[in-house]
């Protein structure tokens, strides 16, 4: 079974930056999640990246991940009316070295 990854891009409101980082530092791994990363891509821009054992593990974790997102949603800037505050993508790992 192929590993699966998800990536979520977001921008944090300036006055919520420290609170956003604190919430992520307290985040535990979800069942089926092999690892997770928060990368800073700009002054207030971030991508959350996670590697999963399988797509089904990611799907099972979605309700809990949405709860986490709802708890921090007020800290993030809207990317666009179509996307809201996050730009998520996911897919199977095609190559790993």
Q: Language-model features: where?
A:
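Short S/T/G/P-rich N-terminal loop/turn motif that feeds into the first structured element of a domain
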Residues: 1-70, 74-97
